[in-house]
Amino acid sequence: MKKCSRRSNASGKSSITNNSSSNSSVSLVTTTTTTTTTSNATIALNDSTGTKSTKWLVDKVRGVNLGSLFIIEPWMVPDTWESFGCTGYTSERACNEVLGLDTLQSKYEHHWNTFYSQGDFYEMKKRGLNTVRIPLPYWTVESTIRDDEPFARGSMKYVRQTVGWAKNAGLQVILDLHALPGRQTTESFGGDTTTLLVSFFSDSNYARAYEVLKNWTTLAHTDPAFSSVVAIEPVNEPKQGIQPGLLNVFYPQAQKVIRDTEKSLGVTCGGSGKKCLTIQYMSSSWGSGDPSSHIDADDNVAYDDHLYTQWIVDESQRTRQGYLDFLCKTDRMTSMNGPTIAGEWSLSTIGGGELETWSDGALSFFQKFAAAQIHAGEKGAGWIFWSWKTELQSNTWDYQRAVKAGYIPSDLSRIDTSVCDGY
């Protein structure tokens, strides 16, 4: 969903449609061979015959995003943003251009180094989570930053620290290219709100993104700290609608760059004993086209659906029952011919009244809402909550606060698995 709308909890925009129910089960597993989408089928990225070899280690992804760690979204971390002197600016570039990196560089480095700690990752593991998705900007690879782009340097040192913490805790990692050269969005998560122009969709900016993907792929296979990385997502939430070259140029070439890089390192997806990365694309439900139309969809590909119920359902469905009805009936997670992860979702609501966290019966509703979200995600390959932590007093965007509030059980084995019975 559009993240400035998401962040302010105001109404958002979406071209995504509501789909009907399905009983299909989609897994990321290491011992299953089925590769087609049928009722009650399991779609695998790995099999026991040795014909494929990937880095996935879990059956169902249960994870959290590390939002606002390497790309600050001001709505999520208002205290940090104020400490930067950036209050009122809506993106990193907007503030950087005015205050300058001479002032801000050390503040970014302090944030990268301290917003998370090793203890966060041990706590994630304790809560039954197995995956972290790390939203990253292209400027982690400094050679791709143009002279006129005022973004802080030096973040890769801290990315390495972060993936190492995940590795130490036994968590697998998805590297998500969240902010792309030239902007794939005008929202704050793209790092640049200084213009309404979206300029990513060009050969020159694609080339910079390919350089990032090559760098990350190399690190995933050569740097021990990055051995926890199991997947790369080449673009997060591109501008909706059919964008020039996204489907027929960028998507297949991104796949080729990753696979060619792996091949040069002696890593293949076919029986070598080496473990290739999964490549994850936004699903067609996002509204920017069907990525499977121009890629090799059998080449260890997965899809990402951002299951923000509050912006997907019609206004008439913005009730407690409407939210649960949608989640229990939707087949969004099984509509692609491949494993689909709900790569972002939250417990945020739109509609007021009975949907407010302070309304009568709120605890019972939000427990059911969380269980239904998890149910919907696990119809597919799993789910990743947005986000593990914020600086908000919000139980709906912050996984830790949601657990403390009783919305999500501290032990995921206690989630209500009967929430969708009868649908």
What are these regions (language model features)?
Residues 224, 228-231, 235-374:
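Extracellular glycoside hydrolase catalytic/binding regions
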Residues 74-89, 150-153, 182-200:
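Aromatic- and acidic-residue-enriched segments that line the glycan-binding/catalytic groove
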Residues 21, 26-129:
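N-terminal carbohydrate-binding accessory modules
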Residues 140-144, 181-191, 349-353:
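Short acidic/His/Gly/Ser-rich catalytic and metal-binding motifs that mark active-site loops
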Residues 110-132, 147-179, 190-231, 257:
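An active-site-proximal structural segment forming one wall of the substrate-binding cleft
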Residues 62, 334-420:
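Substrate-binding cleft of secreted/luminal carbohydrate-active enzymes
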Residues 1-15:
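C-terminal membrane-anchoring module of eukaryotic surface/secreted proteins
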Residues 62-66, 132-134, 173-177, 230-232, ...:
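Hydrophobic faces of well-ordered beta-strands that scaffold small-molecule active sites
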